[in-house]
A protein has these predicted regions:
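Short, conserved loop/helix-junction motifs that constitute active-site signature segments
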Residues: 32-35, 99, 144, 168-173
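A short acidic, often aromatic-flanked loop/helix-cap motif at beta-alpha or helix-coil junctions
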Residues: 60-67, 112, 135-138, 184-187
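Alpha-helix N-cap/loop-to-helix initiation residues
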Residues: 22, 88, 137, 159-160
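Generic secondary-structure signature for well-ordered alpha-helical cores
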Residues: 38-41, 74, 122, 168-173, ...
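A contiguous loop/helix-start segment that scaffolds small-molecule binding in enzyme catalytic cores
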Residues: 10-14, 27, 78, 146-216
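Short gly/pro/ser/thr-enriched loop/turn and capping motifs at secondary-structure boundaries
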Residues: 46-48, 111-115, 159-160, 184-187
């Protein structure tokens, strides 16, 4: 029989690494990572593990990291590390557009949203979850006004103070504004304040915001 040898294709693993420190990495996710030859992810995540790694690259169509996976998965077991849980605003959405379901596995993780509500000792079953991390939300004020509890993933381009100012500019008042900073890290801090006060706070770091109606 002639022709080139056929190499089996390794499944790609999309792995939720949790909200920050390795303390919140699940045992199943850790075992999956240990079985990978190469990890794709942000330096904040890949530096937690000894394997060879590459940063995620979203450029191009398909994105450069997807192209790398397609070209190398026959000879490498590749793990894609995402913060929190893969099902919540992660690179999983990109992977699912280019790979059939049988070609990848998803390892769930603990999201920063879960940890934030755990810290507050509140349910998040009724929360609307939005992300401004690397994206725009053109209808933010209407969505916040329509829901009694909203969690927002932020990034440096959309810090909590800018979110508070935008909501105030649309006339939204009377909401509690909770800033969860660097969750799971030693410097973790949670600030419960108002929209008006939050608009003046100079904050940076890994931040999540929860906006909810004040208790009567």
């Amino acid at each position: 029989m002639s022709g080139n040898p056929v190499h089996p294709v390794n499944r790609v693993f999309v792995i939720g690494v949790g909200p920050g420190t390795a303390d919140y990495l699940t045992p199943v996710a850790r075992a999956c990572i240990e079985g990978c030859d190469l990890l794709l992810g942000s330096p904040r995540l890949t530096r937690l593990f000894p394997q060879e790694s590459r940063p995620l690259d979203f450029r191009g169509d398909p994105p450069a990291s997807v192209k790398y996976i397609l070209e190398n998965r026959s000879r490498q077991k590749i793990g894609v590390l995402v913060s929190g849980d893969p099902g919540l605003y992660s690179f999983l959405g990109v992977i699912s557009r280019y790979l059939p379901p049988e070609d990848y596995e998803v390892m769930p993780g603990i999201s920063s949203v879960q940890l934030a509500f755990a810290r507050l000792k509140e349910s998040w079953a009724d929360a609307l979850i939005l992300s401004l991390h690397g994206r725009q939300e053109t209808d933010l004020a209407r969505k916040v006004a329509a829901h009694p509890k909203v969690a927002i993933l932020t990034d440096p381009s959309h810090p909590p103070q800018a979110i508070a100012r935008a909501l105030l500019a649309h006339g939204l008042k009377g909401r509690e504004f909770i800033i969860c900073q660097d969750l799971s890290y030693p410097e973790e801090r949670i600030v419960r304040t108002t929209l008006e006060e939050a608009a003046q706070l100079p904050l940076s770091g890994s931040l999540l915001v929860i906006i909810q109606e004040k208790a009567p």
